[in-house]
Amino acid sequence: MRFAAGAYAVIFDEAGRVLFSHRRDCDFWNLPGGGVESGEAPWQAVVREVREEVGLAVEVERLAGLYSWLALDEVIYSFVCRVTGGALSTSDESDDASYFALDALAANTFIEHAARARDAALGQPQTILRIPTGPTGREQMRQSDG
């Protein structure tokens, strides 16, 4: 069995809010990130994805969570990242980016991404390992279209 891999960034500002980007292809907010390409390590992918999606240069601080969507044969790496440069901007994938307090997320935030941000905010020294049971982002998009 081969797993597809994704890598997402949890980026906190000085007030403890988390950066989310708004997708162009659907009306949802998500953590910046995406697929790990062939020949790329997950920590390299998250740095590339953040730069491409929201214009920020980041440095990976730690692996906060590892999530295995068994039914999808997918593994998601969630990294806490620190901004080292760049400026928030839009892209082909993102039409907005903003920091949100975890208790004041937009109603149209992907459930799985909100959960990853909350896990990272716990600040646990060990990586959180989870098999998610809620709806995937794809399922949320289908439900919102129906």
Regions found by a protein language model. Give the residues of each.
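Nudix hydrolase/Nudix homology domain
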Residues: 27-29, 93-146
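Conserved N-terminal beta-strand and adjoining loop/helix that marks the start
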Residues: 1-18
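Structural motif
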Residues: 18, 74-78, 97
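Active-site segment of metal-dependent pyrophosphate-handling enzymes
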Residues: 55-87
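Short, well-ordered beta-strand micro-motif
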Residues: 11, 78-82, 98-101
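Short helix-loop capping/hinge motifs at secondary-structure junctions, enriched
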Residues: 17-18, 86-89
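Structural detector for helix-capping/boundary residues
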Residues: 34, 48, 61, 100-103
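Conserved Nudix-box catalytic region and its N-terminal flanking loop in Nudix hydrolases
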Residues: 13-52
